[in-house]
From Swiss-Prot:
Function: Potent inhibitor of trypsin.
Residues the record marks as site: Reactive bond: K16, M17
Record organism: Halocynthia roretzi
Name assigned to this protein: Trypsin inhibitor
GO cellular component: extracellular region
Length: 55
């Protein structure tokens, strides 16, 4: 099943780091900034963002 993601946050982007998919402020992967972003959800077309759980 693909991830149904909503609530796009333009300040954040999905990044692959250390094998993990995280959502971080663009240009910044600091730990304290990751939680400021929505969840990073993967789906067949790429990545989107969700303020709720990836489904």
């Amino acid at each position: 099943a693909h991830m149904d993601c909503t609530e796009f946050n333009p300040l954040c982007r999905c990044n692959k780091m250390l094998g993990d998919l995280i959502c971080a402020v663009i240009g910044d992967a600091k730990e304290e900034h990751r939680n400021m972003c929505a969840l990073c959800c993967e789906h067949p077309g790429g990545f989107e963002y969700s303020n709720g759980p990836c489904e």
